[in-house]
Amino acid sequence: MGNIFGHLFRVTTFGESHGGGVGVIIDGCPPKLEINVKEIQYELDRRRPGQSKITTPRKESDTCEILSGVFEGQTLGTPIMIWVRNKDARPQDYQDMAIKYRPSHADATYDAKYGIRNWQGGGRSSARETIGRVASGAIAKKILQQYSGVEIVGYVKRIKNLEAIVDPTTVTMEQVESNIVRCPDSECAEKMIELVEKIRDLGDSVGGVVECIVRNVPKGLGSPVFDKLEADLAKGVMSLPATKGFEIGSGFAGTTMTGSEHNDELYTDKLGEIRTVTNRSGGIQGGISNGENIVLRVAFKPTATIRKEQRTVSRQGEETFLAAKGRHDPCVLPRAVPMVEAMVAIVLCDHLLRHYGQCNTLKSENVYGN
């Protein structure tokens, strides 16, 4: 239960951190989409461990294999299976966690629910599960880009109390990828790297915020009431490990404004398109995309597994202490950027297919544009 995401573009992830490998089955991808391993591998390389001095030292190439659904470089319209083998697992590092629960991790809750758990690296609660999401996101990005030139750019906005100054309307992927922390504000990025290294040396961890902007979004994605676009985006990104908050557009800051201050006034541009003067709605109104940029932010807590000794209990309820071993990120933010982008792409791709299935079967004129 809970391993499948989406309606028409359906993603099913499988595998565990220290098992044979992890992967994904993607159902509902349109046929004849040109896709190759290199495009998927590019996104996985942005997510993989061991990529810099501020990420987990676990050495995994995360080399992907496409096992089905693609023939001669094109999708078949049938389920696509992508597989990544685990090659640097060290289950012995987690022996203490077989009997001791990590504070603020999924150990105790998994035991409470299932009565059994894979304590080697956390099993399904490990961030290695997100490999399948990022691989799926690469395909979703390709569909969105081909349809209307959709561009999704995520970046680290804040780590602990260090906040970058970034204009989301102009930020580029090149700026994001110019440093190991994936923060387009180069001056702030240097401070962030220093902070993460300092915290890591103390055996501790830090959290922060990833901001994501989506450009060239088609109008009309999303549905009223239960399937609002922002609700599905929230579900998608909040299903990622370590997430603790979500906001879109003005978010919580909008609560300090009056209606006249917050409303996005309308105008007609030179092409006759209805546009908004401001974008406090974050590109979505009434649960439906309005064609403006979608801007969202996701809060990530500090990594739960740390070397610093903390009080906990055993499976038998006995009070004890745990200084976690193993290899873990002192800050998940740099590797979380492609994860957020992937979930945003999956949600938008799913809604694009749903929109066309409902609204373009019988063509009709729409006064609000295409």
Swiss-Prot record:
Q: GO cellular component annotations, sorted alphabetically?
A: cytosol
- The residues that the entry says bind NADP(+) are 47
Provide the reaction this enzyme catalyses: 5-O-(1-carboxyvinyl)-3-phosphoshikimate = chorismate + phosphate
According to its UniProt entry, the protein's GO biological process terms are: amino acid biosynthetic process; aromatic amino acid family biosynthetic process; chorismate biosynthetic process
> Per the record, a Pfam family?
Chorismate_synt
Identify which top EC class this enzyme belongs to.
Answer: lyase
Enzyme Commission no: 4.2.3.5
Q: Which Gene3D superfamilies match?
A: Chorismate synthase AroC
Pathway involvement?
Metabolic intermediate biosynthesis; chorismate biosynthesis; chorismate from D-erythrose 4-phosphate and phosphoenolpyruvate: step 7/7
Known cofactor(s): FMNH2
Positions with a binding annotation for FMN: 124-126, 286, 301-305, 327
Keyword annotations from UniProtKB, A to Z: Amino-acid biosynthesis, Aromatic amino acid biosynthesis, FAD, Flavoprotein, FMN, Lyase, NADP
Q: Where are the bilayer-spanning segments?
A: none
The record's annotation in InterPro entries points to: Chorismate_synth, Chorismate_synth_AroC_sf, Chorismate_synthase_CS
Cofactor comment text: Reduced FMN (FMNH(2)).
- One of the record's GO molecular function terms: FMN binding
Fill in the subunit field for this protein: Homotetramer.
The UniProt family comment states: Belongs to the chorismate synthase family.
Q: What PANTHER family does this protein map onto? A: CHORISMATE SYNTHASE
Q: What is this protein called?
A: Chorismate synthase
* Native organism: Trichodesmium erythraeum (strain IMS101)
